[in-house]
């Protein structure tokens, strides 16, 4: 059993200043200083969901992050413009300077247009291991994108239909990181329908769809992949054309994957509860729920009382072991080679053409339980895609100025159907945080203790 422990020595020193030029306008600048010291390698909870800031191969590292954000509105208050950047430097055995985020956004009413690289808003104080989204956490450094979206749009204003609101986004990513297929693109669209069942209860359902498309493969059998010419085939989930690889012609164009979304929100004056279920698919069998056992389930609870000892709780479970079954186009009877069974072995987040998998800057875009294999500085996909994981987290306040949280996760890794582990590998991870805010200064100190136990992350 591997054991790894780490202590964040200086934690996070955060200095921020906010000033307003008009009621709707503001500028915010903050500086964060981090020092991480580990006995072996950086533990799971300190490394993940940090937008790729932490280098897990450096037991000792220091970082400085500069955060800048500006909000302005036009004189008529018709548009609101946000823009900002997060720049970082890392000092250690390997030092680096990087631009983590850089973005601009213009909003009008319920609609917005965003351009640049920007992380997702932190949900439930970071207690969720996926930031509440199985496919889009804050685990990886974001690539730049152009995104058109809506938040809380109400298409109907009368009768029962006024209870319906819609969230959506349509985005195209420019993949600037090094990967097996260079100059590839990533398409993303998501729509969520919210139905207010009562004053306190809202049900939602939606669809989340991702596609890797285009690019140049180093494989001589594939080479340059069709680009914008086949754009509608990619975004509509159609089969490839005559210029596509044979596998795309037989199936669908590009690397297509996504999830069906379901949830229930309950909000009272005293508390808020959310139940959520996210069901992943990689092909038609998954979309039709042939892999019903697989998915991501969670519940979050938060007291709305100001600064109680225990304020929030999140419990989540993930399973990806079914993958629509162990057979894919398998002939059980050698005498009947055309009698094939099975549409399984989905091998989530890996792909035969886009070998780097569902990653951004060599980190899983979604659930950090999935850890890519890195060879010569490039992700070659995920060695284990059949995983079960359970995690829980809690937070609250010891006083008005002292915040605390605790997290724990246990996961089992079974490899792939094509390459199963002789015995499952496992990982237990835990972290606790204490943050103290200065009484009269915009400064806070954060101390984190974290540990890993298990054999999965041995290097």
Give a label for each model feature.
Residues 1-26:
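Bacterial Sec-dependent N-terminal signal peptides
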Residues 64-72, 99-117, 144-151, 189-196, ...:
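Feature captures outer-membrane beta-barrel proteins of Gram-negative bacteria and organelles
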């Amino acid at each position: 059993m591997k054991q790894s422990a780490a202590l964040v020595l200086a934690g996070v020193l955060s200095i921020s200043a906010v000033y307003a030029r008009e009621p709707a306008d503001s500028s915010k600048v903050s500086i964060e200083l981090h020092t991480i010291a580990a006995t072996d390698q950086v533990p799971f909870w300190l490394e993940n969901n940090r937008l790729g800031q932490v280098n897990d191969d450096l037991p000792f590292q220091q970082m400085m992050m500069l955060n800048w954000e500006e909000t302005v509105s036009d004189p008529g208050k018709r548009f609101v413009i946000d823009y900002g950047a997060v720049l970082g430097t890392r000092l250690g055995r390997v030092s680096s300077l990087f631009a983590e985020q850089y973005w601009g956004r213009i909003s009008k009413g319920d609609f917005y247009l965003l351009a640049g690289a920007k992380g997702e808003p932190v949900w439930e104080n970071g207690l969720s291991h996926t930031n509440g989204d199985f496919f889009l956490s804050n685990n990886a450094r974001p690539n730049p994108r152009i995104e058109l979206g809506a938040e809380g749009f109400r298409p109907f204003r009368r009768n029962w239909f006024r209870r319906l609101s819609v969230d959506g986004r349509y985005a195209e990513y420019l993949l600037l990181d090094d990967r097996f297929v260079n100059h590839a693109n990533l398409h993303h669209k998501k729509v969520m329908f919210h139905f207010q069942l009562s004053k306190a209860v809202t049900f939602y359902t939606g669809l989340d769809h991702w596609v890797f498309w285009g690019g140049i493969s180093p494989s001589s059998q594939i080479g340059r992949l069709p680009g914008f010419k086949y754009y509608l085939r990619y975004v509509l989930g159609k089969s490839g054309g005559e210029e596509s690889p044979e596998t795309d012609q037989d199936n669908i164009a590009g690397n297509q994957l996504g999830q069906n979304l379901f949830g229930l929100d309950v909000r009272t004056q005293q508390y808020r509860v959310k139940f959520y279920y996210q069901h992943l698919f990689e092909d038609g069998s998954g979309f039709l729920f042939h892999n019903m056992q697989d998915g991501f389930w969670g519940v979050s609870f938060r007291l709305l009382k100001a600064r109680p000892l225990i304020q929030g709780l999140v419990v989540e479970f993930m399973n990806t072991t079914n993958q629509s079954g162990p057979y894919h186009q398998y002939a059980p009877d050698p005498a009947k080679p055309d009698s094939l069974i099975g549409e399984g072995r989905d091998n989530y987040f890996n792909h035969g053409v886009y070998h780097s998998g569902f990653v951004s800057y060599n980190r899983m875009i979604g659930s950090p339980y999935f850890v890519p294999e890195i060879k010569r500085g490039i992700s070659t996909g995920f060695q284990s895609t059949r995983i079960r994981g359970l995690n829980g987290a809690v937070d609250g306040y010891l006083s008005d100025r002292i915040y605390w949280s605790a997290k724990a996760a246990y996961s089992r890794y079974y490899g792939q159907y094509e390459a199963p582990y002789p015995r499952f590998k496992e990982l237990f991870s835990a972290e606790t945080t204490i943050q103290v805010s200065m009484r009269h200064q915009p400064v806070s100190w954060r101390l984190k203790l974290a540990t890993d136990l298990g054999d999965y992350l041995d290097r």
